[in-house]
A protein has these predicted regions:
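Alpha-helical hydrophobic packing sites
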Residues: 8, 18-21, 213, 280
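Short, positively charged low-complexity motifs
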Residues: 6, 18-19, 40-43
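Leucine-biased recognition of intrinsically disordered, low-complexity hydrophobic segments
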Residues: 7-10, 23, 35
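N-terminal, intrinsically disordered charge-dense segments
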Residues: 1-3, 28-41
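Active-site neighborhoods and metal-handling regions in enzymes and metal-associated proteins
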Residues: 37-296
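Hydrophobic alpha-helix-in-membranes signature
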Residues: 21-24, 243-244
């Protein structure tokens, strides 16, 4: 194990990352945010109670969206229909879909079918078939706060090996989340996931990972889902980030991005890929999953 990144609070006049204030000079949250610098990382925002409450509300809307869309994921539906349903649901719940027009992304959700790892673009041409798997990734903005989650659904009835694969992917995420608490290293996420899935001859996508979230769509730290010494960062109360492993149903973790649309990421060997995601808060002695739907 390499040296552990040290936590140092920067003076207010020197709270910079990559040459600029990540919150921007006019951000209404800037005055109340505590920013910390890690050697070997960049800048991680420690959220206060007001911000955590706001992020929790946004996260619940995102989770409720995934719960709402589940009965519509059936054979014969196209992903543009799913996109519109999710868009309308978020808007009706006073939220804005964060992906819409984000760096030019044209839709309100990501819909990734079968060998699409992430960032699939909804389309009327993508019609679900019995046995498909599809990941729906939703990020809701509510009152300026962000909540991010995703889930892989099975369309109809799939091959038992595929059903098992999807279940193992979700278990990998849950095992990693259960290992989180203040004082542990962020790298425990990747170590836990990689160790678990590789025993089934699956692999962890390395090109994409989780991220800090809450005041922005994407914040530091980057969260690796394989063992990575760059993630040897001490977890601290008030950190919020996503745990979102992308697992390939083969030993080949490599992916390729569509040259046509610049977004769609597929497995290089055309194997299936599954993903689950939660937004997670580090509490005083453990963790809290913020992206849980309302009961009922």
């Amino acid at each position: 194990m390499g040296p552990i990144a040290q936590l140092v609070e920067l003076p207010a006049h020197n709270r910079m990352v990559r040459g600029s204030n990540p919150l921007g000079p006019t951000n209404k949250f800037a005055a109340s945010v505590r920013l910390y610098f890690y050697r070997g990382a960049d800048m991680i925002i420690i959220k206060n109670k007001e911000q955590i409450d706001g992020i929790r509300k946004a996260s619940i809307i995102a989770a409720n969206t995934l719960k709402y869309i589940e009965p519509f994921i059936v054979e014969g539906v196209n992903t543009e229909q799913l996109n519109q349903l999710c868009h309308d649901f978020m808007v009706q719940n006073n939220a804005i879909p964060a992906t819409l027009n984000y760096h030019g992304f044209p839709k309100s959700i990501c819909s990734s079918i079968n060998n699409v790892v992430c960032h699939g673009i909804p389309s009327i041409k993508d019609v679900l078939k019995n046995g498909d798997i599809i990941n729906i990734d939703v990020t809701a903005i509510h009152e300026g706060y962000f909540g991010d989650c995703s889930k892989t659904y099975i369309v109809g009835k799939a091959n038992p090996k595929i059903t098992e694969f999807v279940s193992i992917t979700e278990t990998a995420m849950n095992l990693a989340i259960k290992a989180l608490k203040p004082g542990n290293l962020l790298s425990i996420i990747g170590s836990t996931i990689q160790t678990y899935v590789e025993q089934f001859s699956y692999s962890v996508v390395r090109d994409y990972g989780g991220h800090g979230v809450g005041l922005h769509f994407h914040e530091d730290p980057h969260v690796s889902h394989f063992h990575n010494k760059e993630n040897e960062i001490i977890l601290k109360k008030g950190m919020i980030f996503t745990v979102e492993p992308m697992i390939n149903m083969s030993k080949n973790w490599r992916v390729v991005t569509s040259k046509k649309d610049g977004w769609t990421v597929r497995t290089k060997d055309k194997s299936l890929s599954a993903q689950f995601e939660h937004t997670v808060l580090i509490t005083s002695d453990s963790y809290e999953i913020l992206t849980l739907p309302d009961e009922g």
